[in-house]
From Swiss-Prot:
<dbReference type="GO" id="GO:0042274">
    <property type="term" value="P:ribosomal small subunit biogenesis"/>
</dbReference>
<dbReference type="Pfam" id="PF00163">
    <property type="entry name" value="Ribosomal_S4"/>
</dbReference>
<dbReference type="InterPro" id="IPR022802">
    <property type="entry name" value="Ribosomal_uS4_arc"/>
</dbReference>
<keyword id="KW-0689">Ribosomal protein</keyword>
<dbReference type="GO" id="GO:0015935">
    <property type="term" value="C:small ribosomal subunit"/>
</dbReference>
<protein>
    <recommendedName>
        <fullName>Small ribosomal subunit protein uS4</fullName>
    </recommendedName>
</protein>
<keyword id="KW-0687">Ribonucleoprotein</keyword>
<dbReference type="GO" id="GO:0019843">
    <property type="term" value="F:rRNA binding"/>
</dbReference>
<keyword id="KW-0699">rRNA-binding</keyword>
<dbReference type="InterPro" id="IPR005710">
    <property type="entry name" value="Ribosomal_uS4_euk/arc"/>
</dbReference>
<comment type="function">
    <text>One of the primary rRNA binding proteins, it binds directly to 16S rRNA where it nucleates assembly of the body of the 30S subunit.</text>
</comment>
<dbReference type="InterPro" id="IPR018079">
    <property type="entry name" value="Ribosomal_uS4_CS"/>
</dbReference>
<dbReference type="InterPro" id="IPR002942">
    <property type="entry name" value="S4_RNA-bd"/>
</dbReference>
<dbReference type="InterPro" id="IPR036986">
    <property type="entry name" value="S4_RNA-bd_sf"/>
</dbReference>
<comment type="function">
    <text>With S5 and S12 plays an important role in translational accuracy.</text>
</comment>
<comment type="similarity">
    <text>Belongs to the universal ribosomal protein uS4 family.</text>
</comment>
<dbReference type="InterPro" id="IPR001912">
    <property type="entry name" value="Ribosomal_uS4_N"/>
</dbReference>
């Protein structure tokens, strides 16, 4: 069974809570991506920060070790869809920000694919179980969708939205 792992917080809040520019930027991002609360935004910022930190730590390694480790990191980020090209330098990883992470959320991709009319409807469709990835129902709007899974997103089997879409396609 092994040792139980130590649970960690998945997010880190801002160091100073009342900076006007940051508050305005956060409100704008929450509206654009249909986030329910700032914690969801802070999770994305923390994830992006961790990737940037890993990339910075690779820069201090010897060249032969850095080459292999950076290739693994870049391929992983490419599969996640956070970078556009698998053959980029480690400097590209330093450009990852919270918006790139928010673009990969299931809620955002459902909206961008046109399965929902608004970003808020996209969240509701996901939470209510109307969206599936490769036939498996996913009810977490914050699920990070990989490049391979992005093509497999559709309405869930048995969803009334799927039936309506099929009827509209036949008509």
């Amino acid at each position: 069974m092994g040792d139980p792992r130590k649970p960690r917080k998945k997010w880190e809040g801002p160091k100073h809570p009342w900076i006007k520019e940051r508050l305005e930027r956060e409100r704008e991002l929450m509206g654009r991506y249909g986030l329910r609360n700032k914690k969801e935004l802070w999770k994305a910022e923390t994830l992006a920060r961790r990737f940037r930190h890993r990339a910075r730590s690779l820069l201090g390694l010897p060249p032969e070790v850095r080459r292999e480790a950076s290739r693994v990191l870049v391929e992983s980020l490419y599969r996640m869809g956070l970078i556009d090209n698998p053959n980029v330098d480690i400097d590209e990883v330093l450009g990852i920000n919270a918006e790139k992470v928010l673009e990969r959320r299931l809620q955002t991709i459902v909206y961008k694919k046109g399965l929902a009319k608004t970003i808020y409807q996209a969240r509701q469709l996901v939470v209510h179980g109307h969206i599936a990835i490769a036939g498996r129902r996913v009810t977490s709007p914050g699920y990070l969708v990989s490049r391979e899974e992005e093509k497999l997103i559709d309405y869930a089997p048995g969803s009334p939205f799927k039936e309506r879409a099929e009827e509209a396609a036949q008509a």
